[in-house]
């Protein structure tokens, strides 16, 4: 995100340098391109800042969703004295509780994003879809508490809840896959909004072709 902000600052500088101040009198936050197009730098900069901040928040959610895969890698394992893993079958209750806590955090962050004012219709739809998928995942884990909410939760049940590559997906994986798809789409849309805001600055000047008539 720091690299993106640096690039935005550089873009603003280049736009300012490439614009002229001829023509009508401009306000302090405005510049004019060579074709006469007036850019409100304050407005465009604010739009870029808002889009970038929103995309950063979505990236946090995306990272949390992907972290469930990392947790799934610890199913049926314990740490050895040499730092490696050893088998510990049928003791996955705490791991599943941790995954459920992550799911609740995902829901909380998506609820905040869903309440943001001024979202485009596309972003609003993507946030709502991700929020719905997140709630479906956490609700599924809660519904399966008989098998998942105990210290002796089996490896098979834990994998059916958290491991997306598992053949059996009836304790949460189906919902987790849908959440992954939804949050991927949300991140893509959020990054697209940033790019669209930047393009307002970098759109090329339209040059009229000279007349072919003598």
UniProtKB/Swiss-Prot annotation:
It is a lipid-anchor. Pfam families: Lipoprotein_6. The keyword Cell membrane does not apply. SUPFAM superfamilies: Outer surface protein C (OspC). Genes for both Vlp and Vsp families are on (usually) unnamed linear plasmids in B.hermsii HS1. Belongs to the variable small protein (Vsp) family. This is Variable small protein 1. It comes from Borrelia hermsii.
């Amino acid at each position: 995100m720091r690299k993106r902000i640096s690039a935005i600052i550089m873009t603003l500088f280049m736009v300012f340098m490439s614009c002229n101040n001829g023509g009508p009198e401009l306000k302090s936050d405005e510049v004019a391109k060579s074709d006469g197009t007036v850019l409100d730098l304050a407005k465009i900069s604010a739009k870029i800042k808002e889009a970038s901040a929103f995309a950063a928040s979505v990236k946090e959610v995306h990272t949390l969703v992907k972290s469930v895969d990392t947790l799934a890698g610890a199913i049926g394992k314990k740490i050895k004295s040499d730092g490696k893993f050893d088998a510990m079958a049928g003791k996955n209750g705490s791991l599943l509780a941790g995954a459920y806590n992550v799911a609740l955090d995902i829901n909380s962050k998506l609820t905040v994003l869903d309440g943001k004012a001024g979202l485009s219709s596309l972003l609003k739809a993507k946030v709502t879809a991700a929020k719905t998928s997140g709630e479906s995942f956490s609700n599924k884990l809660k519904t399966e508490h008989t098998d998942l909410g105990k210290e002796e939760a089996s490896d098979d049940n834990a994998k059916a809840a958290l491991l997306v590559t598992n053949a059996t997906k009836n304790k949460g994986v189906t919902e987790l896959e849908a959440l992954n798809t939804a949050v991927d789409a949300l991140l893509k849309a959020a990054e697209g909004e940033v790019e669209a805001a930047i393009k307002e600055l970098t759109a090329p000047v339209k040059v009229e072709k000279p007349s072919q008539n003598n």
